[in-house]
Every structure is written in structure tokens, then in C-alpha cells.
């Protein structure tokens, strides 16, 4: 890839058509937010100003809005201003396909046409296939990266991008978003940035290649920093884990989560929101509990409308519908109906 680095694409970022496309993407699901409405008041003027700043190199990202989310787990989110969201979409519109071109085939995050549901379906089919061949003697290495986004090294990431991209204007923009992390150290990229999602996927592509091309891992599936490898023997899984830990520490400056483990296929594996078994898959228990908490909150606190509860349940049942969960969905449907009925009596 280094022999054919991408060049002469910077001007594509600031075309009128690309900036308007970026604006439309940035406002998706946020049309009535104050920041979106404020930017839209003088849409033409704001896009022209952004266009000029990016072109002459004076553009700098603004201050993050920092807040916490608590589901599926507690995380600090640093969200960029709306105009920066537009600029990031404009950048990714142009460079995204070049970055994704080098992704490992079974890497499922941030890739159009893939995603968590496909990752789950592919793993489920392979689980069933290997269980049919080898019975219970299939070994699983289930791993993820400890504090992944907060541990990404800026120097390593910039070097990776420079193996793909030659265009100095594009690299300058990428570096701006990498360096603007809300911290005083060159480590970590903010989860709230659109660019961070695709950069984080780029970052682990070196690990994908190492596991597949050097260690010859036969079956590997990754969704962002969460990955699963399947082996015929425990010894193979242990060797892979040992070498992966060394590679991550020395080359990518990352550590595996202490919960990383090796076990037999019959125990099932948690991946992309489901627990997979050789002949079926279930919704994870924490997902069920989160939906139950929303129902209890609706019943007890009164700070959630029926429409909000139904929207949350619709999203959850869509996720649950990709598992063997018909009875579970029926039970949860009755709970939601009961909760709404109690409030309307």
C-alpha cells in the first residue's frame, strides 16, 4: 500500500457538493437541535466560511461538549461542535473509502453493508460449522482492548495514515482531529468524533494482518476492538494470545482487557450484543436488564413519555429479533403494554 499512497484528493473535500452532503449527514437525527438550527440559519455563509478556512489552512476544531453515558457501560463522550461534524463528514466522504479498502475482510465496524448483525450471523454460521466438524473440541479466544479509544497512540496512528495517504492537506486535517483530543498528552482520541471511529478501525488493521498473515489464525472476527478467534486446540489459542499481547504492547502500545480468556465453544461467546452457542444465540443478559430498567423508570419516575418508551423498545426488539428470542420479545412486549396501560388509566 505504501507504493500507491493516495494523493491529490484534498480539493474534493471542499467542493460545494461535498460540503452540502456533509451538512446533510451531520444534521441527520439532529435537525431540531439548537446547534443545527443555528448553523442552518445562515447555511450558505457558514459553509462558505468553513470552505475557506479548510482551503487556506486556518481551520481549527472547536471545544468539545463533554458528557457521560451509562449504557451499555459508563463512558465519557466528547462531542464536537456542529460545524466540526460537518467538516469531519466532508473529510470522511473523501478519504473513508481509501481507508476502508485496507480493512480485514472480517472487520465489521464502520463499514457500509456490514455492522454488528452481519458480524453475529457470520460468527454463528462458523460456530455451527466447526461444532459439526469437531464437536465440543473448538477453542475460543475472546478478547478486547483495555480502554481502547483512550489508549490510541497519536504517533502510531499518524504513521499508519501516512502509509495510506500522501496528500499533505488531507494529513493536516487528520492530524488536527487526532491532536484535538481534549487532553494534554498525545494519547487517546475522542469517542464522539466521526473521524475517531474510522481511525480506531485503521489502528487495529496491523493486528488483523499480524494474526492472519504471520500467526495464520484460521478464524478471526473483529468488531472495533472486540475480537474472537477460533482454534482446534487450546495450545493454538494460548500461543495466539501470547503473541498478540506482545504485538499489541510493542507495536501498538495497547494492552488487552484483563477479562480476555480462552474456553471451549460450548460455553458460548459474547460478541456484538449476543451470546453465541453452536446451535443458537441469545440476547445478552445486560441488554435485557437495560430494557427492564427503562420499563421500571417509566413506571416509577414519570420523566419518560410513552412515545420514548416505545421508541426504546422498538430499537431493543429490533436487536433482539436477530437472536432466538421470540418468547423473550413477547414477554417484554407485554411488560411495555402493561406499563403504558397503568399510566393511562
Predicted regions located by residue number:
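PAPS/PAP-binding and catalytic site of the sulfotransferase fold
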Residues: 90-94, 241-244, 248
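Active-site catalytic microenvironments for nucleophilic, acid-base chemistry
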Residues: 94-98, 206, 210, 247
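Conserved two-metal-ion catalytic palm core of "right-hand" nucleic acid polymerases
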Residues: 1-157, 182
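Intrinsically disordered, low-complexity and often Lys/Arg-enriched segments
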Residues: 1-12, 246, 337-345
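Right-hand nucleic-acid polymerase module
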Residues: 80, 89, 180, 185, ...
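Conserved polymerase palm-domain catalytic core
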Residues: 46, 53-54, 106, 121, ...
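Short, conserved aromatic-histidine micro-motifs
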Residues: 57-61, 217-223, 291-305
